[in-house]
Amino acid sequence: KGTGAHAASPQEGNNAVTDISAVANMPYLENLRLRGTSVQDLSPLSGLEELRELQFGDAVWDTAVDLTPLATLTNLDYLSLPASMAPTDLSPLGELTNLTGLSFDGSSNNGWITDLTWLSDLNQIDQLYLPVGELTSLKGLEGATALTELNLYGPMYLTDLTPLASLKNLQRLYLYSNGTSGGGVVTKDLTCLSSLTRLSEINIEADGLESLRGIENLTELTSLRIYNSGNYDTASLRDISQLQNLTKLKELQLYVAADIQDFSPLSGLTGLTSLQVNGNFICSDYSFLSGLTELRELYFNGDSQNIRIKDLTGIQNLTKLQTLHLTVGALESLHGLENLTELTDIYLTGSDASFTDTAPLQNLTKVKTLRLPNRGYDVETACDLSGLARMTSLQEFNFSGKIKSLAPLAGLTSLRVLDINDQARDGEPALDLSPLASLKGVTDMTLQSQRVSDVSPVGQMTGLRTLYLGVGSYEHPLRDISALSNLTNLSSFTASGWTEITDTSPVAHVANVTIN
């Protein structure tokens, strides 16, 4: 007279469990786990009327399995089915009126559930996780009034969300079409959710969304993530005014339309710890972010031609920031970063930058990844990298623009990835690579410069595995790569630009060599 039984996943080389007829003699069984099995015949389960929990997660069901024997398990409280199961008739589950939790566990590349009508009588179900496929209707969900969490994932095209309106207990809503283009929720606004005032999390993929109208009264929201199945160009959200009263928000992610210019509704969301905005929006400064002092993550990504920012003073008060991803076009100064000493990752993307020094970075000693926006080819003044000298935690550095000197990099021995595109023109004084000789931990390096023809210091960077050299000029081509014979860990080498290499024996040990 046991209450639980567990058939675990078989060890490699053994056969999976396929026969569960023995459990028919366990009428008092309350908990049964058949994870990783290959059971196809469920009839032995039909008499287990005391069963409360049944798990098939990660079971191997390559063909449709008859779920009819489960219909008699009316005391069943929780059921997990394998996510990778073959398309199966789920209607027998409609008899499990005491079910509070239903999930499809394990990995699934393709969802297949296209009909939800069998859910209409499951008014006790509390949590629902379903892999769907080409789902076009939510009909059936209106009866699952006890739901607090709904998670539908897979290809879907939903134009009518009204079945959700009756789910007054819903706290967490996830509708994600796995990036299916033109899929997800296809609606202009979110008025269908306006009565779901207990919602704390919304995570949906929405196409055609123009306004957030409908969420203004959802004041319990702590997380709002709205994705777009296409790229930036397809986003259509241009009205975010409804956000201003959602002061409990901690996480916010949006894809916005190209013609949106007013981000002031974000300024009052002072509890935000994570903010992500993507789109081809227009922006001339980030001052509307100045009061969001609880932010740990900030992502504002778009087209740098539409985002023309002179400096970063708009974010200077965000001293708790750890991750910063900003698109900045025509950036003239890094001023504004000086006091953001908790930063570990900085990604400043964009073009036409003209900043000439990195002094604002000198106190950011926790930074591990640093990418600076591309300086324009027409910027004559070389950039001083001295501000990096104390950034000894730096592991990855990406820079494009004319460089004054590489000397500030000499002490950055934690570096693993280095990408330098020196945009100085041919004829200017040679760029000395000797500061790189101490960077023996660098494994991947890209170096481009017309004023480099002596690469001998690179031969001391013995940790290198991948090396791209786009160096040399018409007057001073790259000829000698003998120093590279010391790079015994090197597996890939490319030499491009102006090269006149006649002796390739120094890289004979390298598996992949390309010399243009």
Which residue ranges define each predicted feature?
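Acidic, Mg2+-coordinating catalytic modules of nucleic-acid enzymes
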Residues: 289
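Conserved alpha/beta core surface patches that mediate binding of polyanionic ligands
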Residues: 360
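Concave beta-strand-loop units of leucine-rich repeat
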Residues: 1-18, 28-40, 44, 50-69, ...
